[in-house]
């Protein structure tokens, strides 16, 4: 057994490319070794902006032998009456590269056939690995790649060196004009000389560590966090928590070194989001806060190189930030010369989407949709504030500050609203209507912000789909998936029992002046299909797919209600008796469909001849009363527990009673009984879609 070590050294790879490339290397090498029949131990990838490396411990010295069996014609066609090979047999043997005498008889599902078993002897690992590693590096995919001017190969950035060692012995691997060797290189400035490697992962990490390179991202993360903690303390506070920035900086440096800087205290008069955005998004600096979380006029920058005089680096970082903050102060002061209401008409000169008109049109439609949603939810008292918040929600798009810092849309509008003395809830709604942002958990703080947020996303979703633009495959230029997910997350988080179909119709009403690419009914169905697709995708990440399908089939117009039904069904499925319950209710649902679907049905007790059907009706009448009250309260776990008590009676009914009796009156009465049983659960879930079977004991009984 020997360790395999493979490293690709390159010019600075963009930070966002490195984590994905390391995952690819790990997955692809493990799969390639398995496909090559080379046994191995741990496979792990590590890397920095200048190198991607992967190793496999304890690689077998040679491939395992491969046995393959090929089947030919039936024996009756392969041999004549005297047992001599026919042309069919000789032709098959020739195609397999063997003598006819090597053919054997084998039983197959298609009868007895001639066959040949071939054994491919395993080759030595050092013979297999060079081509395998060349395919590995050629198979790496990046969002953008560069082509060398000297050859046709591509990579994220030009490849400068490679290392390929098996048990310390070099393997001959090429990528374009670069051939592999057994030396790597340390930090570009602090240890640029070649470093000979023994080929083990531990040796690789240790030698690079001495050369100012922490190749293992987790080791580098620990060092980075320690540096940030030290620097925050030096700055008289602590570094503001920012996991996303930590992740980014982690792949910008090979050995982190933190430097504390300072900016003018007067810049703390700017909204803190402006200062933080300037530091983190434009300069990759970490903000420093005091014990109460208030911003200090300090920052921490992470350098890729430890310099002899930190003051030189600090001065450079401060100079760049000083200029950026001066620009921000200028935009802030200019913006404040005009009130938000004075900027509303400016939205008419800003196009939202060519076929959907201006941002002013958009703002007016958002107000109409938000008002309709409020009325549908019984929140009529919010309508006046919703119209005001909707008018102002997009106004900051025309400010200098948002023009310079697009990520602060909504945030700046809220700050300006507070400074102008507008209602705090209006200011909050201006900021909150963009939430949730991506996968962030932060949601709108109030109904006002939530309803404007839902209305904004509904307008985009219905409008964009309505004019014929759709999300296809990976392409979603208008962010329709993000809009749909945002709608669903807000509605569920706020517990809004809202009809999606009604909300879409209200949005189409607001878009009355827009020329749709298809009929109104078709557009509405396309939007609802799109929303259902997002519901399905989101819920199948957490719940069994069959349960999701069962719940959606029973209705998804009210997603809050559907989510509660799904959670109750998942809880029920975890119980040991669920299999029997599901099987029984599947049979009920199938018969119910034959009887004309769910609904009230007359059952004549006088026609119930069999004790099993009489007992079922008695149990049913008791359960119907209990279920009615619990369904009204949307207590679906209790509904399912109550309905489950019917399972023994239903099972006995199916065992003892012929539903499709020859007597039409008996048959209709029994079908009516099934319809009443089905009505208890048909609006909760379609049990026919649930994958479950009765326990073996129940089936045997």
Curated annotation (Swiss-Prot):
The UniProt entry, under InterPro entries, shows: DALR_anticod-bd, Gly-tRNA-synth_bsu, Gly-tRNA-synth_heterodimer
One Gene Ontology cellular component annotation? cytosol
* EC numbers: 6.1.1.14
Q: Which UniProt keywords apply?
A: Aminoacyl-tRNA synthetase, ATP-binding, Cytoplasm, Ligase, Nucleotide-binding, Protein biosynthesis
From the Swiss-Prot or TrEMBL record, what is one GO molecular function term? glycine-tRNA ligase activity
Predominant location: cytoplasm
Question: Where is it located?
Answer: Cytoplasm
Main EC class of this protein? Answer: ligase
Which domain of life does the protein's organism represent?
Answer: Bacteria
Indicate yes or no for the key word Ligase.
yes
List this protein's GO terms for biological process: arginyl-tRNA aminoacylation; glycyl-tRNA aminoacylation
Q: Which reaction does it catalyse?
A: tRNA(Gly) + glycine + ATP = glycyl-tRNA(Gly) + AMP + diphosphate
Q: Which HAMAP family match?
A: Gly_tRNA_synth_beta
> What does the record note on quaternary structure?
Tetramer of two alpha and two beta subunits.
Record-stated family: Belongs to the class-II aminoacyl-tRNA synthetase family.
Give the protein's recorded name: Glycine--tRNA ligase beta subunit
Which species does the entry assign this protein to? Answer: Anaeromyxobacter dehalogenans (strain 2CP-C)
């Amino acid at each position: 057994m020997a360790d395999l070590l493979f490293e690709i050294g390159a010019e600075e790879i963009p930070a966002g490319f490195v984590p994905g490339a390391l995952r690819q290397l790990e997955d692809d090498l493990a799969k390639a070794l398995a496909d090559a029949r080379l046994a191995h131990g741990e496979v792990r990838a590590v890397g920095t902006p200048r190198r991607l490396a992967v190793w496999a411990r304890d690689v077998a010295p040679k491939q395992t032998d491969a046995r393959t069996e090929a089947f030919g014609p039936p024996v009756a066609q392969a041999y004549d009456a005297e047992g001599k090979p026919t042309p069919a047999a000789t032709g098959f043997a020739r195609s397999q590269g063997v003598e006819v005498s090597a053919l054997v008889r084998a039983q197959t599902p298609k009868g007895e056939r001639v066959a040949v078993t071939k054994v491919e002897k395993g080759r030595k690992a050092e013979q297999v690995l060079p081509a395998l590693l060349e395919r590995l590096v050629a198979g790496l995919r990046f969002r953008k790649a560069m082509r060398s001017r000297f050859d046709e190969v591509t990579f994220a950035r030009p490849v400068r060196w490679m290392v390929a060692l098996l048990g310390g012995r070099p393997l001959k691997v090429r990528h374009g004009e670069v051939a592999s060797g057994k030396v790597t290189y340390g930090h570009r400035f602090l240890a640029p000389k070649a470093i000979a490697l023994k080929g083990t992962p531990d040796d690789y990490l240790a030698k690079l560590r001495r050369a100012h390179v922490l190749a293992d991202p987790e080791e580098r993360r620990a060092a980075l966090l320690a540096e940030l903690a030290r620097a925050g303390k030096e700055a008289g506070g602590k570094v503001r928590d920012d996991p996303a920035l930590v992740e980014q900086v982690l792949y910008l440096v090979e050995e982190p070194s933190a430097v504390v800087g300072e900016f003018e205290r007067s810049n703390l008069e700017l909204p803190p989001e402006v200062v933080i955005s300037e530091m983190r998004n434009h300069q990759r600096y970490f903000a420093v806060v005091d014990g109460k979380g208030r911003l200090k006029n300090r920052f921490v920058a992470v350098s890729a190189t430890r310099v002899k005089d930190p003051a030189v680096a600090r001065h450079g970082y401060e100079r760049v930030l000083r200029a950026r903050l001066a620009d921000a102060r200028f935009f802030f002061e200019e913006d404040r010369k005009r009130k938000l209401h004075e900027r509303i008409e400016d939205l008419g000169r800003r196009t939202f989407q060519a076929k959907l008109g201006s941002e002013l049109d958009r703002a007016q439609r958002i107000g109409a949709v938000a008002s309709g949603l409020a009325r549908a939810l019984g929140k009529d008292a919010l309508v006046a504030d919703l119209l005001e918040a909707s008018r102002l929600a997009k106004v900051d798009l025309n400010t200098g500050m948002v023009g310079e810092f697009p990520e602060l849309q909504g945030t700046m509008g809220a700050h300006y609203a507070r400074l102008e003395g507008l209602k705090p809830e209006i200011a909050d709604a201006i900021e909150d209507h963009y939430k949730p942002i991506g996968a962030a958990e932060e949601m709108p703080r109030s109904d006002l912000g939530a309803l404007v947020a839902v209305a904004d996303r509904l307008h985009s979703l219905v409008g964009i789909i309505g004019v014929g633009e759709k999300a296809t495959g990976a392409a979603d230029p208008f962010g329709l998936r993000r809009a749909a997910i945002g709608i669903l997350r807000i509605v569920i988080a706020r517990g809004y029992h809202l009809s999606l179909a009604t909300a879409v119709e209200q949005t189409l009403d607001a878009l009355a002046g827009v020329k749709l690419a298809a009929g109104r009914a078709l557009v509405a169905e396309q939007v609802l299909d799109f929303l259902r697709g997002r519901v399905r995708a989101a819920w199948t990440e957490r719940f069994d797919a069959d349960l999701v399908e069962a719940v959606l089939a029973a209705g998804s117009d009210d997603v809050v209600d559907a989510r509660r039904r799904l959670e109750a069904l998942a809880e029920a499925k975890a119980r040991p008796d669920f299999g029997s319950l599901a099987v029984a209710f599947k049979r009920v649902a199938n018969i119910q469909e034959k009887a004309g679907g769910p609904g009230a049905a007359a059952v004549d007790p006088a026609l119930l001849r069999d004790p099993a059907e009489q007992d079922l009706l008695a149990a049913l009448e008791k359960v119907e009363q209990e279920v009615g009250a619990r369904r009204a309260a949307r207590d679906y776990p209790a509904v399912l527990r109550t309905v489950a008590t019917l399972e023994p009676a239903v099972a006995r009914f199916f065992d003892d009673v012929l539903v499709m009796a020859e007597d039409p009156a008996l048959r209709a009465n029994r079908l009516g009984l099934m319809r009443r049983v089905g009505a208890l659960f048909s609006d909760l879930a379609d049990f026919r879609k649930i994958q479950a079977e009765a326990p073996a004991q129940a089936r045997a009984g």
